[in-house]
């Protein structure tokens, strides 16, 4: 069983396997040919349209389009076989199938995917070995390529997506990578007399080799980056709603699909009139713009698909960002045994500890607490234990602390861009509403204390508990997996705090007149706690063990009238505290 997800380019046959299916009589359905959605009189879905019941399934459970099988399944017939109406060819089944069944638009010619053209780096230009501006000129039909026969004579020209498709179809990946390796070895001669050009060519060839290797390893053909069949999302994901006043509203994706189907059908009709290809260049360019607007509507400067001075929401906008499908619905979904709260700093915690609010702890560890209360004879049954937990009795918190002492929880901060975005900590009960976090682990989470929130997850199985205790614990994740640099770094406020603690008050009044002399460190700390000195006040401390400190130097003590000369050190109480913390850490 594979425990990973791999994303790669889908072939046209793979897209057809997603979107096309066959009826019991052998008829293939799935292709959308009609840009109409609802019949203007009956308000029912049009066959071959964006809401077609033949392609996506019936709109009502166990009922076909014409109503022939309306009462059949209400009488208790078994629904363990595929039944298709002989009149309307609609499958009689559950209407929930309209949530996952897809259709497709058979494009007249392969179109360019805007992600591979307008992204950085431009993978289309890298694969073809051309400049980005030249590729864009050809895509927007500002340049062309000539088609020659075996005799070298020009028999036609190609431009736009058809020219790109012609170039990609002629690429042999095995021969291309062998050629690139030879060129990479051949440019070594440039290193001696033109080093800058050598570096530029070397980077260019290495990037192209990496891309070609990725295509070879995933068994992907270069022509697959062109769009042959455009998938159409299920109708329930792009709903059409009818209001009480008869107004029909629908999502922006439906408008974009309508434009694509209309432009595609228009080119098909023009070809039936046997018009020269030169007369259809404008329609081809228009169809390319419509598909680009469907995929990503932001990069189109002059957008003809605007409603109320607002661009239509493309499929890319529905996927990316904080409110996109991934972060909002897939990665950020609510799961059982989890909580969420704001994080605040608590430097008194250990590196592997975190503060957990009492309300969250009582709710997440509710079943375990019930079991422990019954085991320790605090409660007779489950109902009594729940009442004690709800009232937060005096003996509940000690039992909860005993449970948390041997338990580890997972803290996650979205977005989880690398594996350090989720780590395990030993929880400590706090009577606040926020999660307490050690400031040193914030750099791994990319978190700060300006309102960031973190999620709490409880591992349940023994395997997950062992993994949280050994692998995910914060003290075992001190380096970044990408480059090996330390992930536990002091933040700016910690550096400023160390600077403030070790700062000296250079006022001459403190240095020369108000001399504070103490016999040992304990008396200095006692004076600070009594409020006699400040944290940056100079103090003079008698050095009683100076031979151990100045081991390699000779100190001469002169006796004059039996008076012993002492050695003093000038320091501050802040430096004494800082030195104690360093010694305790070491």
From Swiss-Prot:
It comes from the Eukaryota. Zn(2+) binds at residues 64, 66, 85, 88. Mg(2+) binds at residues 448, 450, 452. One of its GO terms (molecular function) is DNA-directed RNA polymerase activity. One of its GO terms (cellular component) is chloroplast. Pfam families: RNA_pol_Rpb1_1 (PF04997), RNA_pol_Rpb1_2 (PF00623), RNA_pol_Rpb1_3 (PF04983). It is found in: Plastid, Chloroplast. Its EC number is 2.7.7.6. It catalyses: RNA(n) + a ribonucleoside 5'-triphosphate = RNA(n+1) + diphosphate. Its cofactor is Mg(2+); Zn(2+). InterPro entries: DNA-dir_RpoC_beta_prime, RNA_pol_asu, RNA_pol_N, RNA_pol_Rpb1_1, RNA_pol_Rpb1_3, RNA_pol_Rpb1_3_sf, RNA_pol_Rpb1_clamp_domain. It is an enzyme of class 2 (transferase). GO terms for biological process: DNA-templated transcription. The keyword Repeat does not apply. Keywords: Chloroplast, DNA-directed RNA polymerase, Magnesium, Metal-binding, Nucleotidyltransferase, Plastid, Transcription, Transferase, Zinc. Binds 1 Mg(2+) ion per subunit. Binds 1 Zn(2+) ion per subunit. DNA-dependent RNA polymerase catalyzes the transcription of DNA into RNA using the four ribonucleoside triphosphates as substrates. Belongs to the RNA polymerase beta' chain family. RpoC1 subfamily. In plastids the minimal PEP RNA polymerase catalytic core is composed of four subunits: alpha, beta, beta', and beta''. When a (nuclear-encoded) sigma factor is associated with the core the holoenzyme is formed, which can initiate transcription. This is DNA-directed RNA polymerase subunit beta'.
